[in-house]
């Protein structure tokens, strides 16, 4: 017989199941990349949610200037703490920081389930249980107001 505390815990976990929280840090290129990822996830019928609602977290990092690297590392550490507390089940890191410092990050933060670079979208999708849909190349879910959007010129 489950006591009330266990029942509440199970109910909370089941509500969070397979919901992806995408945290985007850094520049407009990362916003664009996150919008493309959301478009791919939607096409795969994956549920992208806001912060506290997800049990799977993807952190899209920036790694070019010191403050951005610091913000990215601190955000990853916060998510690792949530994972260790059982608040999230999986943690993935993508973006510039992961691209540039992957070996160091894997060594220093092994609690992250996987690290992906800026061109690893198909591999990230596979880790999230989704397929890369070539026909959606460039399609995305915009997160900006309708009167403007980011356009990615280069990597």
Predicted regions and their residues:
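Proteins enriched for Cys/Gly/acidic motifs involved in redox and nucleic-acid/cofactor modification
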Residues: 1-155
């Amino acid at each position: 017989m489950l006591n009330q505390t266990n029942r509440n815990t199970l109910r909370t976990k089941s509500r969070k199941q397979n919901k992806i929280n995408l945290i985007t840090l850094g520049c407009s290129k990362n916003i664009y990349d996150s919008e493309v990822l959301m478009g791919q996830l939607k096409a795969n019928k994956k549920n992208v949610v806001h912060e506290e609602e997800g049990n799977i977290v993807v952190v899209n990092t920036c790694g070019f200037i010191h403050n951005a690297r610091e913000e990215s590392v601190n955000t990853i550490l916060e998510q690792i703490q949530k994972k260790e507390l059982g608040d999230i089940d999986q943690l993935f890191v993508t973006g510039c920081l992961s691209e540039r410092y992957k070996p160091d990050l894997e060594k220093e933060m092994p609690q992250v389930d996987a690290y992906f670079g800026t061109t690893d979208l198909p591999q990230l999708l596979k880790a999230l249980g989704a397929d890369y849909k070539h026909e959606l190349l460039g399609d995305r879910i915009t997160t900006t107001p309708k009167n403007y959007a980011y356009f990615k010129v280069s990597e």
